[in-house]
């Protein structure tokens, strides 16, 4: 019975063990599908299921018929034009990170948008070049393709060997196709959950480190220095060493241009951020500075007068598709997997933000398919891997973009540049593109502030951020990502391997039990210990669990058991020789000079000392906490009941089951009753299947709650001094109620407590 009285509640019910609860309340039989059942369901097909699959594979079929032309079209047009202009500039700039000519960045900004329009589930993200992925692809290109013209690479694009450029483009395209295939396979296999292994802290630390890599890699373009390309661990330090050893060769014109562009871009981005509510659209500062820089470079003939590096030849139209290299596949499978996972993680996290903001669903597996197909098409047409750039997606959303129609229109802008006006960008300095690339890193570089916030919230997450950053900086992006994931998983193991176990006590004299160290006024029944483990118990932490339990109770049950068995052997010898008598006042030893050989006892097999104590052959009972014969001393223990709170223990493995049963047996053999509370039915069923129970450890030790176990102990022990019992009421039945004012107490008008075992 449950009765609500104001802000209190009164509960009257029997005290239940898990076994008696199951006997009184029968569970319904549920049919659990087997693997064959799931296989049949996957292989079966109906018209309704086929329609559902088609709609999931092509989300455009769901939202395009419901498109509100009058309400959304104008906003999408404005957003598409703004996003397209940004995409053009970012494509050109991020191509430098891949170590290929800027023109190929336009392909990377065009093809993924087209495929995502049909296959994507997010309405607001802008798919295309992303600096972190561009940097990761560039690292692979640098490693696979050796540069024969490193010293003259920066002078002009025309000095680069055509076959060398084609080889770099082939590697970038092959890596992109392979990462797309990996994403497509993961999506088809419905394993989009892999992104959960990249926590927000890890992604933040990794992208911040990638931003540092981008910053360092662009120094050679901003200063126009002949810096060799490095791809091995510590490459960032080698690049910095090369830059500073050649700093006297800096092209002043490129340096001044870069600084001016960088300062102006940062200032106007701050203005856009601060006054975004007042501006109808963000100021397209990248476009404005690109137009100005191109005009000045062309009008003043910077290339000939100051020897600056320019974009150079921009062939109009598309190049024919290529077949990816299988050899590159074999050499870059690990890098491609990292690119695939990072690209999906970034895109999915940004898409999730907008889906929550505008209240529409996204499908992680379908996003994998969409990104995979996008990268496959992009790589086939000589583009490089993409995801979603935060700044570009922000432009698409902030300028009023409602659907991917805005993305399609942005692709039209890129298309116009590719087929018609790309040649106008030929005088543009590469240092300007480098400065624009750095201008888009502000958000990622600002993530350093996460360290302080994470330190206050969660030390483990803060450590993950710091170590991820260090790994990515020192080892490079590929190895750094792998090491970061491994470290993150290690922290999870560490948290479960060393859980914060605690001893609980009653708070408020009700059914509430909390860590007794956290409260001043607690009640802990004499001889009862409540121990809580807040994590799964498995092979790695069963030893830690046992040690913490021993620390909580204050003694080792195995040590007590062995000492009692040793003492029992001595008592048997004394009794057989007639040297001991049992009286109501205790033992009387008739020979004070009797001494047994400790060495003889110590040489007994340990297995015998670990067996249950058996006193049936003696004509008297032994009170191990009472007085024992002379020369026989063993530690006395006041504990008679131990409650293990397993409400947070989600699973046990086979190894830990054996260890747990051994621990329980040790306590039971020294007459300490053990109770386990808070487990679910599946937990107990698994123990039964694994033959956990025996004559000593039975399923009757399981109770629904801590309070059920406490009430059972109080009634079983029938305390004469407990505040829960009264010596004047020993002859009548005990009754309890839960009351927030008086706690557990006896009342004259009671609901009988039924103890069922």
From Swiss-Prot:
Subunit structure: Interacts with PDZK1. Interacts with CFTR, SLC26A6 and NHERF1. Interacts (via PDZ-binding motif) with NHERF4 (via the third PDZ domain). This interaction leads to decreased expression of SLC26A3 on the cell membrane resulting in its reduced exchanger activity.
Glycosylation sites: 149, 161
InterPro entries in the record: S04_transporter_CS, SLC26A/SulP_dom, SLC26A/SulP_fam, STAS_dom, STAS_dom_sf
Function: Mediates chloride-bicarbonate exchange with a chloride bicarbonate stoichiometry of 2:1 in the intestinal epithelia. Plays a role in the chloride and bicarbonate homeostasis during sperm epididymal maturation and capacitation.
Alphabetically ordered keywords of this record: Antiport, Cell membrane, Chloride, Glycoprotein, Membrane, Transmembrane, Transmembrane helix, Transport
Localisation: Apical cell membrane; Membrane; Cell membrane
Topology in the lipid bilayer: Multi-pass membrane protein
CDD domains, alphabetized: STAS_SulP_like_sulfate_transporter
Gene: Slc26a3
Family of this protein: Belongs to the SLC26A/SulP transporter (TC 2.A.53) family.
Tissue-specific expression: Expressed in spermatogenic cells. Expressed at high levels in cecum and colon and at lower levels in small intestine.
Motif PDZ-binding: chain residues: 754-757
Source species: Mus musculus
GO molecular function list: bicarbonate transmembrane transporter activity; chloride transmembrane transporter activity; chloride:bicarbonate antiporter activity; secondary active sulfate transmembrane transporter activity
Topology feature Cytoplasmic, residues: 1-71, 115-124, 198-201, 272-278, 357-367, 426-462
Name listed for the protein in its UniProt record: Chloride anion exchanger
Reaction equation(s) it catalyzes: hydrogencarbonate(in) + 2 chloride(out) = hydrogencarbonate(out) + 2 chloride(in)
GO biological process, one term: cellular response to cAMP
Extracellular side: 93, 146-176, 223-250, 300-335, 389-404, 484-757
């Amino acid at each position: 019975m449950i009765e609500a009285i104001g802000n209190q509640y009164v509960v009257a019910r029997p005290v239940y063990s898990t076994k008696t609860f199951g006997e009184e309340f029968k569970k319904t039989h549920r049919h659990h599908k087997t693997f064959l059942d799931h296989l049949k369901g996957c292989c079966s097909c109906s018209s309704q299921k086929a329609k559902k699959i088609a709609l999931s594979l092509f989300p455009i079929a769901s939202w395009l018929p419901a498109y509100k032309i009058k309400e959304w079209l104008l906003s999408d047009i404005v957003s598409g034009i703004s996003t397209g202009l940004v995409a053009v500039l970012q494509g050109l700039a991020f191509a430098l990170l891949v170590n290929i000519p800027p023109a190929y960045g336009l392909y990377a900004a065009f093809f993924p948008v087209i495929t995502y329009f049909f296959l994507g589930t997010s309405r607001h993200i802008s798919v295309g070049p992303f600096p972190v992925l561009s940097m990761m692809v560039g690292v692979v290109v640098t490693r696979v393709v050796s540069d024969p013209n490193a010293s003259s690479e920066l002078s002009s694009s025309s000095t680069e060997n055509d076959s060398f450029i084609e080889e770099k483009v082939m590697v970038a395209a092959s890596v992109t196709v392979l990462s797309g295939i990996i994403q497509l396979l993961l999506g088809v296999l419905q394993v989009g959950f892999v992104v959960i292994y990249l926590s927000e802290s890890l992604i933040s630390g990794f992208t911040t480190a990638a931003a540092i890599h981008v910053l360092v890699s662009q120094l050679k373009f901003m200063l126009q220095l002949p810096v060799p390309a490095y791809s091995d661990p510590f490459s960032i330090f080698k690049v910095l060493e090369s830059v500073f050893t050649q700093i006297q060769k800096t092209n002043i014109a490129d340096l001044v241009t870069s600084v001016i562009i960088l300062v102006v871009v940062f200032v106007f981005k701050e203005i856009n951020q601060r006054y975004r509510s007042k501006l109808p659209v963000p100021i397209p500062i990248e476009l404005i500075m690109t137009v100005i820089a191109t005009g000045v470079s062309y009008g003043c003939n910077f290339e000939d007068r100051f020897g600056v590096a320019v974009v150079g030849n921009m062939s109009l139209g598309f190049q024919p598709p290529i077949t990816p290299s299988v050899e590159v596949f074999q050499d870059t499978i690990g890098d491609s997997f990292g690119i695939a996972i990072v690209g999906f993680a970034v895109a999915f996290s940004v898409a999730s933000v907008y889906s929550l903001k505008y209240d529409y669903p996204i499908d992680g597996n379908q996003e994998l398919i969409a990104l995979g197909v996008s990268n496959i098409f992009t790589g086939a047409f000589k583009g490089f891997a993409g995801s979603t750039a935060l700044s570009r997606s922000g432009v698409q959303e902030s300028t009023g973009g409602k659907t991917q129609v805005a993305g399609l229109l942005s692709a039209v802008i890129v298309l116009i540049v590719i087929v018609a006006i790309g040649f106008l960008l030929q005088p543009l300095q590469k240092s300007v593109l480098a400065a624009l690339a750095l201008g888009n890193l502000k958000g990622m570089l600002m993530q350093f502030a996460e360290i302080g916030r994470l330190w206050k919230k969660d030390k483990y997450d803060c450590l993950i951020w710091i170590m991820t950053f260090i790994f990515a900086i020192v080892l490079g992006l590929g190895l750094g990502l792998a090491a970061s994931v491994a470290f993150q998983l290690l922290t999870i193991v560490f948290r479960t391997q060393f859980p914060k176990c605690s001893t609980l006590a009653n708070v408020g004299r009700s059914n509430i039990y909390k860590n007794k160290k956290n409260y001043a006024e607690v009640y802990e029944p004499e001889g009862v210990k409540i121990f809580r483990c807040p994590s799964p118990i498995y092979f790695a932490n069963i030893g830690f669990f046992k040690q913490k339990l021993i620390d909580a109770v204050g003694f080792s049950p195995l040590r007590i058991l062995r000492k009692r068995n040793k003492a029992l052997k001595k008592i048997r010898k004394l009794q057989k020789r007639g040297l001991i008598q049992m009286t109501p006042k205790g033992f009387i030893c008739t020979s004070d000079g009797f001494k047994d050989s400790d060495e003889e006892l110590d040489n007994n097999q340990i297995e015998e000392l670990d067996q249950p104590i058996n006193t049936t052959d003696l004509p008297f009972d032994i009170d191990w906490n009472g007085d024992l014969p002379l020369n026989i001393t063993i530690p006395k223990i006041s504990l008679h009941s131990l409650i293990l709170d397993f409400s947070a223990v989600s699973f046990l493995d086979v190894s830990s089951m054996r260890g747990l049963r051994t621990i329980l047996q040790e306590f039971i053999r020294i007459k300490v009753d053990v109770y386990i509370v808070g487990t679910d039915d599946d937990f107990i069923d698994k123990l039964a299947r694994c033959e956990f129970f025996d004559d000593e450890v039975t399923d009757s030790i399981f109770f629904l709650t801590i309070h059920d176990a406490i009430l059972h102990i109080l009634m079983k022990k029938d305390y004469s001094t407990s505040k829960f019992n009264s010596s004047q009421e020993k002859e009548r039945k005990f009754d309890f109620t839960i009351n927030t004012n008086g706690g557990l107490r006896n009342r004259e008008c009671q609901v009988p407590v039924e103890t069922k075992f």
